């Protein structure tokens, strides 16, 4: 060993490009205090002090070594390495080439390294020469990380036996690295954990040197240290000019000075399985270590393994992109070419050009591309599966099952799956709320579900094909009545139900099935009377499928005996006695059979199974305990023999027949209940004043939901209902007749029940019960309160419609009470009087009004205002509304009947007024004959609008409306009156145009209320139409036009012919006025429908419930 101190000449690395020693970049100062504490904790043995002293002496000699021998040492070292370059394998384990005694040989390079690695830091070393050495040569060696701040101890992967293989030159590296200049290090250099020492390169180099350096002098070790030092300085000089690199493994770190290292180093990175404790470090995060690692004392969070990077994921030392790309290869440098054929791993992050660094870098996952590829694969292998949706416990999605894009929310999927199920259950029925648009995949899935349900119904004997589809051919009519599915207004109402392909079988066909069962004609005795030979043959053939050939004869004979006994039991005994005897015979038969089987041949399958199951062979015990309760025979050893086959057949046949009868009976009861519900629904809608133009549609939708073959046709006052039976080509016709009335609260309740049924929210039984309770329930307001409302309504309508004065209001209130009493008390008592109620009421009103109006010559009260105001509530406003809606929906029969009835009704009222005025004229010859109020008698126009809300409120309460329904009625009625009032100022002589403008405003508001707030437009529009009718009539005062006729009657005109002509003209004048008003209201409602539903939504039926 030389005493000369070496000078650290960096020219050796430039002159020797084949130098194969590696060194790490230091980045931290030595944290001596921490290292001393750790070392003292781990090594508390007496031998440590001796080893420390010897190693400190060795370190002193190293630092005072000679300088002139470095050149020769380097040359010798290099020559030795080059000689054995080809002979030594890169993958050879270093320990297999080292002598067992080499760890104590001073002149060996490996001995020096091992001894130096077993040493501690001395207390008297200089600051630039402090060493970090661990002292257990047979145990695991510590590993250090260098950076600008300090050095942290790092435990190696390998332990125990691999201690001699890990970093044999650790002492030399530590000594040289402590003399490095840290000022030249780049601040952007990758952190310390990516420059941890990987012993794969040193080990492979040492493997080549082992045959020459095992017995070398220490000068070779010193020359190795100097060469590594020169290489390290050259690396530090090139650090400033190097671009920042991503954090990678040890292989990437050495690539910057790859042109100064040996060509063999390019092969060392490919040999992952070579020896060394640190070969488990992942290179560029994606290389996997294949050598077993003992990580007992390893700090995973600070290691360079995959787990360490995962634990440090949040820092700049964690996982990053890059790594060895799939399909990449490592190519050894061709020295003849003079340039590097860099492998892909090295080219990713350390290429010379910026554009080449990402050639094989792993990119983030593109989920859209993955989704498309998955769809293509699924469609290629499983056609049609790409459009299906998976059913999840909360699923619901508009996306197909192959969609894997993370942006697709499972909740939305779940919300969309639920909407699909609703559409499936309701057969394209939409709920009140807006529904999302379904994708083509959902449509296909929905179509498949419908097809499966239709197939199940087709196989069910209680379903028959819908005659509307194959027999009557009403598809075209359905398309005419209902809008096409692709219309954007299709889902607004939610009442449309597609006609089902299968409907419930009719009652008659079910009865025929019930009473024409051919098996019913056979008695029990005829089924049990079979010959012995036949039964024996049948039973023996049955036994052949279960019994073996060894004991088939004995079993068949016993079965024949059992059959004889059963037959006698069937003939002679009762059913209870027969069952008891059959069970007893069955028990004895099984006992005898088991005894024979136990004593019989042991090669049979039954005996072997019995022996294997119980594995004791207690034959005698089985015989003795045959009559005792035991669980050994609870499990049958073979299928039970049908020893009582005739009886079993008889029982099964009876059970099957009974079950079939029960099914048919339940089916008939269900059909009758559904038909009864449909008729009750029809009766309720007619009684409570549903819009008559939609009654047929309500019934059709209800029958479709209930799967009943029903046909309906409506005439005013009656509904023809036909329930068909396609199997027998018969139909059952019902006629539902009832007096049509108005009850807005019960109409709303009926509408709710109807909605619940068509959306399958409640069953038919519950709906029938609720409907029956609703039909039996009393009215919301008692009759005496309705009479009061009549009086208030008459009081309110007099000022704004007929120009009544303040003094006319109490008179109108009193006369209105009389009209209310006649309607709610007298008319309800006698059906005969209800037929002449309008005429009688008009007579009473005209008589009282003319008598009061004649006071003081007609200057105090206005006869026309009192008479018309008192009769305004019974004017045919609702009849005109229903008639115009029916004409608009092309229901010509009902519409024409109602409109003509409104005209006739008006003629009745006119005739009553004429008769009442004539009666008072006979009494008082000085009775007033004024057809209108005097000027200045009416209330100021600015106060008239205040009575409109009061009139609308009274109309609503008279028609049994809820208080919650009143506000919208008042709003629509008030706005409609304002429009008709100002229209009447300009078109005073044109009654039709005035009524048309008012009805148009009312229709627009009613349709908006129905479309936006999902309310009942008919109930909201009814008071407003009642306001429009009196206003139109009052414009010509045609209601009291019969007053002239009354005067002629009382004055007894001599011109009979002329009087007759005058009488005819006066009688028809009020009817003509009602026709004009009806036409104006109908045209206004048509125009409103055109504005709100510009594409003509026919299926909605204007002003839908």
Swiss-Prot record:
The keyword Transmembrane applies. Residues 1-11, 85-106, 185-197, 390-413, 520-539, 592-606, 624-633 have a biased composition (Polar residues). Residues 67-82, 417-439 have a biased composition (Low complexity). It comes from Candida albicans (strain WO-1). InterPro entries: ThrE-like_N, ThrE/Ser_Exporter. GO terms for molecular function: transmembrane transporter activity. One of its GO terms (cellular component) is membrane. The chain crosses the membrane at residues 782-802, 809-829, 835-855, 860-880, 903-923, 938-958, 963-983, 986-1006, 1015-1035, 1075-1095. Residues 1-22, 36-55, 65-123, 151-278, 385-473, 520-656 are annotated as: Disordered. The keyword Transmembrane helix applies. It is a multi-pass membrane protein. It holds the Pfam family ThrE. It is found in: Membrane. Its main location: membrane. The lineage of its organism: Eukaryota, Fungi, Dikarya, Ascomycota, Saccharomycotina. Residues 162-178, 198-210 have a biased composition (Acidic residues). Residues 446-459 have a biased composition (Basic and acidic residues). Keywords: Membrane, Transmembrane, Transmembrane helix. This is Pheromone-regulated membrane protein 10. Belongs to the ThrE exporter (TC 2.A.79) family.
């Amino acid at each position: 060993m030389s005493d000369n101190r070496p000078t650290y000449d960096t020219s050796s690395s430039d002159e020797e490009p084949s130098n194969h020693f590696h060194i790490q970049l230091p980045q931290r100062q030595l944290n001596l205090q921490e290292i001393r504490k750790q070392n003292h904790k781990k090594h508390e043995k007496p031998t440590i002090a001796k080893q420390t002293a010897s190693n400190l002496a060795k370190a002193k000699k190293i630092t005072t070594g000679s300088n002139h021998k470095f050149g020769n040492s380097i040359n010798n070292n290099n020559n030795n390495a080059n000689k054995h370059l080809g002979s030594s394998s890169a993958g050879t384990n270093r320990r297999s080439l080292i002598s067992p005694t080499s760890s104590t040989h001073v002149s060996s390079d490996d001995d020096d390294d091992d001894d130096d690695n077993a040493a501690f830091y001395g207390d008297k070393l200089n600051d630039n020469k402090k060493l970090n050495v661990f002292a257990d040569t047979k145990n695991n060696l510590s590993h250090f990380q260098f950076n600008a701040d300090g050095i942290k101890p790092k435990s190696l992967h390998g332990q125990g036996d691999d201690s001699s293989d890990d970093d044999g030159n650790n002492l030399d590296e530590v000594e040289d690295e402590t003399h490095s200049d840290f000022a030249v290090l780049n601040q952007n250099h990758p952190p310390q954990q990516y420059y941890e020492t990987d012993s794969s390169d040193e080990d492979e180099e040492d493997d080549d040197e082992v045959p020459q350096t095992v017995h070398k002098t220490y000068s070779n070790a010193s020359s190795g240290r100097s060469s590594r030092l020169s290489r390290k300085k050259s690396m530090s000089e090139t650090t400033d000019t190097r671009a920042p690199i991503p954090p990678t493994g040890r292989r990437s770190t050495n690539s910057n000075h790859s042109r100064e290292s040996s060509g063999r180093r390019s092969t060392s990175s490919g040999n992952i399985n070579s020896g060394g404790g640190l070969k488990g470090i992942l290179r560029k995060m994606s290389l996997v270590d294949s050598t077993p690692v003992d990580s007992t004392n390893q700090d995973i969070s600070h290691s360079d393994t995959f787990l360490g990077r995962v634990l440090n994921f949040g820092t700049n030392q964690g996982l990053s992109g890059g790594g060895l790309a799939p399909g990449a290869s490592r190519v050894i440098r061709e020295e003849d070419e003079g340039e590097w054929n860099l492998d892909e791993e090295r080219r990713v992050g350390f290429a010379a050009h910026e554009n080449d660094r990402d050639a094989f870098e792993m990119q983030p996952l593109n989920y859209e591309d993955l989704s498309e590829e998955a769809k293509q694969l699924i469609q290629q292998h499983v056609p049609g599966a790409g459009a299906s949706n998976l059913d999840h416990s909360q699923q619901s999605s508009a996306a197909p099952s192959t969609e894997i894009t993370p942006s697709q929310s499972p909740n939305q999927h779940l919300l969309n799956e639920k909407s699909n199920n609703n559409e499936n259950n309701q057969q394209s029925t939409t709920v009140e709320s807006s529904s999302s648009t379904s994708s083509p995949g959902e449509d296909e899935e929905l179509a498949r579900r419908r097809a499966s349900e239709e197939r199940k119904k087709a196989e069910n004997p209680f379903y028959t094909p819908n005659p509307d589809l194959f027999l009557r051919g009403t598809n075209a009519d359905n398309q005419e009545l209902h809008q096409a599915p692709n219309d954007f207004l299709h889902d607004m109402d939610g009442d449309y139900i597609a006609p089902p392909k299968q409907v419930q079988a009719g009652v008659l066909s079910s009865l025929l099935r019930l009473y024409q069962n051919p098996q019913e004609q056979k008695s029990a005795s005829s089924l049990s009377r079979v010959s012995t030979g036949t039964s024996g043959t049948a039973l023996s053939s049955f036994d052949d499928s279960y019994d073996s050939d060894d004991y088939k004869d004995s079993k068949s004979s016993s079965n024949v005996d059992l059959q004889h006994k059963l037959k006698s039991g069937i003939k002679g005994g009762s059913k209870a006695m027969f069952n008891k005897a059959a069970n007893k015979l069955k028990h004895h038969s099984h006992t005898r059979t088991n005894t024979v089987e136990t004593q019989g041949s042991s090669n049979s399958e039954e005996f072997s199974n019995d022996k294997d199951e119980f594995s004791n062979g207690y034959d005698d015990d089985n015989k003795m305990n045959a009559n005792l309760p035991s669980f050994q025979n609870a499990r049958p050893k073979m299928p039970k023999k049908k020893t009582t086959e005739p009886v079993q057949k008889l029982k099964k046949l009876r059970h099957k027949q009974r079950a079939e009868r029960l099914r048919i009976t339940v089916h008939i009861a269900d059909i009758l209940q559904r038909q009864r519900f449909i008729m009750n629904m029809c009766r309720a809608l007619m009684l409570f004043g549903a819009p008559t133009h939609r009654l047929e549609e309500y019934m059709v939708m209800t029958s479709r939901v209930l799967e009943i073959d029903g046909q309906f046709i409506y005439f005013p006052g009656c509904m023809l209902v036909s329930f068909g039976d396609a199997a027998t080509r018969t139909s059952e016709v019902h006629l539902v007749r009832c007096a049509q009335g108005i009850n807005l609260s019960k109409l709303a309740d009926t509408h709710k029940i109807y909605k619940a049924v068509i959306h399958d929210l409640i069953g038919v039984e519950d709906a029938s019960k609720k409907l029956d309770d609703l039909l039996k329930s009393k009215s919301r307001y008692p009759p005496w309160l309705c009479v009061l409302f009549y009086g208030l309504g008459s009081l309110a309508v007099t000022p704004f419609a007929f120009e009544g004065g303040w003094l006319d209001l109490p008179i109108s209130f009193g006369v209105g009470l009389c009209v209310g009493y006649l309607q709610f008390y007298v008319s309800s008592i006698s059906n005969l009087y209800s037929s002449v109620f309008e005429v009688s009421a008009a007579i009473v009103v005209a008589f009282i009004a003319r008598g009061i109006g004649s006071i003081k010559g007609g200057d105090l009260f206005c006869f026309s205002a009192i008479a018309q105001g008192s009769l305004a509530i019974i004017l045919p406003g609702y009849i005109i509304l229903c008639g115009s809606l029916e004409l608009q929906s092309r229901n010509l029969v009902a519409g024409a009947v109602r409109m003509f009835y409104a005209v006739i009704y008006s003629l009745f009222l006119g005739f009553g007024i004429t008769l009442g005025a004539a009666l008072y004229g006979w009494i008082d010859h000085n009775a007033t004959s004024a057809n209108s109020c005097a000027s200045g008698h009416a209330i100021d126009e600015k106060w008239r609008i205040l009575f409109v809300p009061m009139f609308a409120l009274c109309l609503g309460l008279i028609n049994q409306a809820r208080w919650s329904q009143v506000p919208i009625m008042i709003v629509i009625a008030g706005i409609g009156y304002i429009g008709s009032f100002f229209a009447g100022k300009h078109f005073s002589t044109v009654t039709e145009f005035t009524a048309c403008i008012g009805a148009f405003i009312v229709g627009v508001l009613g349709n908006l209320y129905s479309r936006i707030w999902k309310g009942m437009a008919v109930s909201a529009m009814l008071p407003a139409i009642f306001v429009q009718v009196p206003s139109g009539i009052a414009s010509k005062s045609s209601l009291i036009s019969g007053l002239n006729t009354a005067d002629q009657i009382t004055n007894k005109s001599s011109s009979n012919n002329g009087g007759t002509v005058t009488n005819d003209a006066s009688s028809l004048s009020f009817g003509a006025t009602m026709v004009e008003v009806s036409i104006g209201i109908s045209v206004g409602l048509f125009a409103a429908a055109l504005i709100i539903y510009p594409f003509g939504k026919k299926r909605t039926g204007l002003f839908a419930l």
